[in-house]
Amino acid sequence: MFTYAELIDSGNAGRVPELFADDGVFEIAGQAPVEGRVALAESFARRQALDRRSRHVITNPLVDVLAPDAATGSCAVLVFNADGVPEGEVGPLDGARVVGRYVDSYRRTFDGWRIASRRLHIDFRPPVTPGV
């Protein structure tokens, strides 16, 4: 739950697929799901290539162990980001880009606990300005 955010925020989005099961799924509300570790690697490599600084603020974590090898979880997330901010400089703060909730399912594998599915449900986001 927290490692996902830390990897992205520390500039290591390319390592995020390691957190998922081989057949893991990541889905953002309103977008097509990204399924399987190969597709996840491609998706997070694109994220890694962006000149974007981000901060994922994770709150209200809940985890329910359903069986020895299965669990579910959720947490609230606020995402702040800014593009093109040089390393070591303070980025502009113009509000959260997304406020929502991650809803996860987890599976224990030979490599330990992995994300089987992660869905981002969006509660709030800034209005879209036409032409901008």
Region locations from a protein language model:
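A short, polar/proline- and glycine-enriched secondary-structure boundary/capping micro-motif
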Residues: A82-E87, R125-V132
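A generic structural micro-feature
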Residues: R52-R55, D94-V98
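Short, surface-exposed loop/helix-turn segments at secondary-structure junctions
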Residues: V85-A96
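Binding-site signature for planar aromatic cofactors or substrates
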Residues: M1-F2, V38, P68, G131-V132
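Short structured motifs
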Residues: M1, V57-N60, R101-Y102
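Short beta-strand edge/turn micro-motifs at domain boundaries
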Residues: A70-T72, R97-T129
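Short acidic-aromatic low-complexity motifs
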Residues: F2-E18
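A solvent-exposed, acidic/Ser-Thr-rich amphipathic alpha-helical stretch
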Residues: A13-G84
